[in-house]
Structures are given as structure tokens and as C-alpha cells.
Design a protein with these regions (language model features):
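Alpha-helix N-cap/helix-start and coil->helix boundary motif
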Residues: 32-35, 58, 154-155
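Hydrophobic packing residues within well-ordered alpha-helices of enzyme cores
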Residues: 38, 63, 157-160
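Acidic/glycine-enriched edge-of-secondary-structure segments
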Residues: 1-4, 61-68, 85-94
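C-terminal active-site rim and adjoining tail of enzyme catalytic domains
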Residues: 71-163
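Short gly/pro/ser/thr-enriched loop/turn and capping motifs at secondary-structure boundaries
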Residues: 58-61, 124
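An active-site metal/cofactor-coordinating segment within enzyme catalytic domains
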Residues: 1-33, 40-43, 47-52, 56, ...
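A generic structural signal for well-ordered alpha-helical segments
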Residues: 42, 63, 108-109
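Acidic-and-aromatic substrate-binding clefts and catalytic sites of carbohydrate-active enzymes
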Residues: 2-6, 29-36, 94-100, 123-127
Length: 163
């Protein structure tokens, strides 16, 4: 729940710009109607390597109309991603069980989509075995920067995936 002591988005963007902005910025949208304000701040801080995700479907369609980089979601509950053709990527989530495999990732990459996988520890599960699998898939598909992982352990991930 946001409150008056939360870091303001503009302050976050200022901080982000002090780091390597070649890294993708995933913006998890939790309220409707933020498009105009967000677009202005992204342009002001010249942030281009980002994507928005997790908003309601009606709100997502407005983000698409405003030419944002929008990811759709695929999970064990959302087997067919919404607005797939209009999305630039797929946020792949495994809430309770491991279902993401090489063929699913390959399908999205062949369709020209970026892919971001939610790492298992974000759902209180062990991550090591799945990271091994994703590393193998990444090498086999030569996915490069088109395949990303969202993790609570970015330093461990950098060391593991880029050794």
C-alpha cells in the first residue's frame, strides 16, 4: 500500500539514471490511469529500456494505444496471454508449479517477443534447479538479451547466468 513516505516515482527514476540503464526496467503497474504521467516521466528521464506489465486488461490496452512497451502475462492460470499480438513481450509466471519449458520460450522468441521469467523465489520456492534449466535453454536457443529473469537475487543471477 502506497503511503506518504514512499519513494516517489520521479525520485526512483533519478536514482535509476545513476545506474546502468542498459538493464531493462520492469514497471509493475498496480493502479489504472497512470499512462500520461508515466509517459511524461519516462521521456523526461530518457528511459527507453523498460516495459510495463501486470495492469488490468482494459488499462493495458490504453498503454498499448500510448505506445508503451507492454508485456502480457502467461501463467498456469493464464495459458493464453491476452493482447498477445500487440505486446512486445511475455511475463512468464509460475505461481505454484514449474511449467515453463524450452518449447514455450522458443515459441515466444520466434514470434518476436521478449521473455521475462519470474524466478521461483519470488513465490517462496527454491530457484536453483530452475535456474539450471533456464541457463541451458538460454544457451540452446541463443536467446541473449531477449530472455530475462526477474529475481530477488540480481547479483547471484548475474554471476550464475554470465559465468
Amino acid at each position: 500500500m502506497a503511503h506518504e513516505n514512499c519513494l516517489k516515482l520521479e525520485d526512483f527514476f533519478k536514482l535509476y539514471k545513476t545506474y546502468d540503464t542498459n538493464l531493462p526496467l520492469a514497471l509493475n503497474i498496480k493502479a489504472d490511469g497512470l499512462q500520461t504521467m508515466l509517459k511524461q516521466l519516462l521521456e523526461k528521464y530518457q528511459i527507453f529500456n523498460y516495459f510495463v506489465f501486470d495492469m488490468s486488461i482494459p488499462d493495458a490496452l490504453i498503454y498499448i494505444d500510448f505506445n508503451f512497451n507492454v508485456f502480457t502475462r502467461q501463467s498456469e492460470y493464464e495459458k493464453k496471454p491476452s493482447f498477445y499480438e500487440k505486446a512486445c513481450g511475455v511475463w512468464m509466471d509460475e505461481f505454484y508449479s514449474h511449467w515453463i519449458d524450452k518449447n514455450t520460450i522458443k515459441y515466444h522468441l520466434q514470434k518476436g517477443k521478449l521473455v521475462c521469467i519470474v524466478s521461483p523465489e519470488l513465490h517462496k520456492r527454491s530457484y536453483q534447479k530452475e535456474w539450471q534449466e533456464y541457463k541451458k535453454i538460454d544457451k540452446e536457443l541463443k536467446a541473449g538479451q531477449r530472455l530475462m529473469i526477474c529475481t530477488d537475487y540480481p547479483d547471484k543471477a548475474k554471476e550464475f547466468f554470465y559465468d
